[in-house]
């Protein structure tokens, strides 16, 4: 993503009467803990002009402070709307189709050759409603299955980690062409959607699971979000649930744990317990795709919501659009699934049994090389024959009953809803541990419900059609909204944690992940194992300044490495303190 991420203006100069606090809370404080910080918002902006298409007007607000140290989180909408009257007509987009085109009832333009060809090219069947004769179907008499890989192509991505609720593409449109691709595993032919310039089935999988062990929260959380923070300048800011849209996210796209209903609760439950974290992951690739550069067929709902976006920039409404469709879409990528779990192991219980974290890893079967093409029954038999040969445990159930595993966190992506629901139920009930058997069962469902696991991204604004009214303005507004969205939910608004702790912004609340030597909401409580001089403080960036005025087509902004500043041999902030952008 471009590094030109715009920060909303410096807000601390506003008067006290410009702030709105969200529900004061009282919490039981630890000794020496900082005072709780409640969510603090600006007051609402003035109402904007009446939008002629939606006949509504909008206003927005911003977040000044996120909840921290036990304070109330910011999980509120930043947009508001009300009905209004306007004499300005909504632009009528009908009647713009060419002479050689058919105009669908929903406004799409089709080539005349697609009318009455037995396929729903319009999306509302209006091209097939009045046919005295039908043309030869594009695929003739052959039955060609719909490709789930093709349906998934172009999947939206939200830079803060949320799974977009809808796709921008109509990937069951074929433009009257019967291009087929063959799945080498099943020998089944699938029809390639028009939107994909390239679609290929190429099943591959990691030969073995990658298993890593961590001794503290901070290292574990940083590792989980390392890939995201390397791709986008979002540091440790995570937003998995929409606040501007009432559309729920999909199962498996976020965070699920056994004893913890949220990542915040997971951090609280594991803080100060000295666990060992076993991080297990494996990827399965089913195929690859590349989207067309031009003439993409966009979904009717995407175009409709784009039409109703106000031309005057209203931050909250544009945030809602981004949370529905993504800040970016996948221009090309790899489709399949990610199997990722974190086991929280009780260090003391391990020691009392004379075991290591690697022993638990073997008992769970993640040291085995399980081929992804294996039959589920055969793979399960192989697992049971080889796993869990330790002096203490004979099988996985004995591991569960021993209390060695305190919690399991699921970061699984892909697989059918039924399979993911079952895994989540196992997590919450603790009736049975999730082990490599469940991986084999999950992998078998990926062809029915794959996701994009690696991608090259393009801003969602690039999908704005030139022919819609105010297309250039709305494209610029979407680019601005992405910058504002990242700045609005930035960890730079969090107060520094104490004693080398790392601040994270999770679901509207600043959380501190502590080093092994401290615990507490702010990492303020030393543990009994604390030895003075063991805590290095890594530097963290403060928020970006406002952009400078535009000169010779360029502008600048700056930030400081003082939130906190590095100390006691800690690392300096990664990245640059000065950013230049075009204007």
Language-model regions: role of each:
Residues 2-101, 105-112, 124-141, 402-410, ...:
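Thrombospondin type-1
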Residues 120-121:
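Short hydrophobic/aromatic residue motifs in ordered secondary structure
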